């Protein structure tokens, strides 16, 4: 792995999140549909970095992107969160591969539909697909997608804030473009990258 995306200096101007899951669909003459998924779901991002001077952002960012050696290396990237959860959130009970409802405890607040979570036992990131608010005992049941790809044990830690995605670049050519100059004549750079989750 080749480090973490330099989020401290390279702020996102735009961030588009996509879900990638190859599905084969066949339709009969009568209109019936047969669908089969042929691999695991993974997330992808298209991110545009704020326009800035090389000394402010782009020197460090260019060096980081070069270290990735195209798509060879993996790195982590953290998108913003939506919910207002606090506490040390843990898995409550044992959950099998394929489960989509997970019991948790130690939580206060609400996980919002669209929030990302990650379990300590593996790198896959999951999306919460329905709001889940902790009850008076700090417990909740969350519904996630995709289904679990690795079983969970009781008291596994759930990461809900600053969830790191392990990703790789999906394009072999990375281009840093200039988009003009500021009022002092400093060249301004812009960069857009496409990444996909590494499972």
What are these regions (language model features)?
Residues 1-199:
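Extracellular/virion structural assembly segments
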